[in-house]
Amino acid sequence: AEQTEYDPSKVSDSLKAIFQFGSTSTKQALNANTVTLITGTIGGTYVQFGADLASVLDDGNKLRVLPIVGRGSVQSVADILFLQGVDLGVVRADTLDYLERKGFAKDIKKQFTYVTKLYNEEMQMIAPKSIASMKDLNGKRVSVDLPNGGTFVTALTVFERLGIKPQVLYIEQRIAMEKLKKGELDAVIVTGGKPYKSVSNFKNDGRFHLASVEWAK
């Protein structure tokens, strides 16, 4: 069969842009139609959603979304406000409420434009089977991830509303899971979209379970 050779420049706007690097109009057009989206940490749901949005919304040089790996919901708030080149961010709904309630920022919600809800997140607690529910966490060593993410915000809010007073520790999730297995922690709180990799990849030897979270209270 006869093969037909195609000129890549005729079918690829990207190639046209690359090889017209000297064109001021090309530079302006690329920058005008590109937005950056700060997401979350590697392995989290935000990163995957960022990649999915970039793929679904891609419209050649008319619209391009560039997802950026971030540090978590709280850090993303600061990045959107202050970091040069960041246009959008994925932020947990309760993060802005927490920052205002605790006096970190006044009227911070007025500094943002809400775009859309992406999905629901779940709060899960991995613990030894001796811990049946959150009410058993008083005085226990509980990891709530690092303080620049959103997990600690959700966890501390739930603890306050339920009147629970654990020993809160800020440990990166993968490290926290290992400490839990070694008996150095009593529970690990995870908040994210389902399925969350740190939960689904957790190698349970039968000693641990997803303990109950009493939302009704």
Could you tell me what each predicted segment is?
Residues 1-66, 110:
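N-terminal hydrophobic or amphipathic helices and topogenic motifs
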Residues 15-18, 77, 90-92:
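Hydrophobic, small-residue-rich alpha-helical packing segments that form membrane-like cores
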Residues 32-59, 65, 120-182:
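Bilobed "Venus flytrap"/periplasmic-binding protein-like clamshell domains
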Residues 61-64, 84, 183, 205-206:
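N-terminal secretory/targeting leader peptides
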Residues 64-75:
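Early extracytoplasmic/lumenal segment of secretory-pathway proteins
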Residues 75-78, 85:
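Mobile, glycine-rich extracellular loop/lid and propeptide segments
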Residues 93-95, 102-104, 165-217:
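Pocket-lining segment of extracytoplasmic ligand-binding domains
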Residues 106-118:
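A structural signal for short loop-to-beta-strand junctions that line the ligand-binding cleft
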